[in-house]
């Protein structure tokens, strides 16, 4: 009997060890791909498709991806599982990266963006102000590397509309050099002195 107990105990221990090994080699310690980008999941929704046999459920994910240094993109993923939907959203966002003109950690000038029923107003702010914005707008701005800005949502409260309106606003921004080139004037004539001083301070 004692021998059987030892064998049983040994067997249980080995099996437990195998379980632990499987657990250690499973998802918990699986190598995770590190990315230099910031990722924010703004919204996850469950959607249903009615088919002959009933309803098929899937998930959609609205994802913001940026490098925190002036580049940002928005993606929308759909899959049967939430992680897969998020992964698709991330890949979609990376395909739609665009550059955002900045002055320090703020924006060059006030701008308003519209998309569907979403309307978002952005205004530059002094250093140390922070991001004064709601969740969807904040996610886009932080991923773009904008940390001092005032914002207000003037339209729909739908996160998708707000995000796309914010993107439209950011795409409407122009750097002082772009404005000066378009008008055929020197930068000093189109940019406020405070803006030029702020840029010089950041550069130094």
Swiss-Prot record:
Keyword Isomerase in record: no
UniProt keyword list: Ribonucleoprotein, Ribosomal protein, RNA-binding, rRNA-binding
A single GO cellular-component term on record: small ribosomal subunit
Composition-biased stretches (Basic and acidic residues): 16-26
Name of a matching Pfam family: Ribosomal_S5_C
Gene transcribed to yield this protein: rpsE
Subunit and partners: Part of the 30S ribosomal subunit. Contacts proteins S4 and S8.
S5 DRBM domain: residues covered: 37-100
Region named Disordered: 1-34
Gene Ontology MF terms: rRNA binding; structural constituent of ribosome
Segments of skewed composition (Gly residues): 1-15
Family per similarity comment: Belongs to the universal ribosomal protein uS5 family.
Free-text comment on this protein's domains from its UniProt entry: The N-terminal domain interacts with the head of the 30S subunit; the C-terminal domain interacts with the body and contacts protein S4. The interaction surface between S4 and S5 is involved in control of translational fidelity.
Cystines in this chain: none
Described function: With S4 and S12 plays an important role in translational accuracy.
Full protein name: Small ribosomal subunit protein uS5
A biological process from GO: translation
PANTHER family named among the record's database cross-references: MITOCHONDRIAL RIBOSOMAL PROTEIN S5 (PTHR48277:SF1)
Keyword Cell inner membrane on entry: no
Gene3D superfamilies with a match to the protein in the record: 3.30.160.20, 3.30.230.10
Superkingdom, taxonomy of origin: Bacteria
Highest classification ranks of the organism: Bacteria, Bacillati, Actinomycetota, Actinomycetes, Micromonosporales
């Amino acid at each position: 009997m004692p021998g059987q107990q030892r064998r049983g105990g040994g067997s249980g221990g080995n099996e437990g060890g195998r379980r632990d090994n499987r657990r250690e080699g499973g998802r918990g310690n699986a190598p995770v791909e590190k990315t230099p980008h910031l990722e924010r999941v703004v919204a996850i929704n469950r959607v249903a498709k009615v088919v002959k046999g009933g309803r098929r459920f899937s998930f959609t994910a609205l994802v913001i991806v940026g490098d925190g240094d002036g580049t940002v993109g928005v993606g929308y993923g759909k899959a049967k599982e939430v992680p897969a939907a998020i992964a698709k959203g991330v890949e979609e966002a990376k395909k739609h990266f665009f550059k955002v003109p900045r002055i320090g950690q703020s924006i060059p000038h006030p701008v308003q963006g519209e998309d569907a029923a979403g309307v978002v107003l952005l205004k530059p702010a002094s250093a140390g102000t922070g991001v004064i914005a709601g969740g969807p707008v904040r996610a886009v701005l932080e991923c773009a590397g904008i940390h001092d800005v005032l914002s207000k949502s003037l339209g729909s409260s739908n996160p998708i509309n707000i995000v796309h309106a914010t993107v439209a606003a950011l795409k409407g921004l122009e750097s002082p050099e772009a404005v000066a080139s378009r008008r055929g004037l020197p930068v000093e004539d189109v940019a406020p002195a405070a803006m030029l001083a702020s840029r010089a301070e950041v550069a130094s």
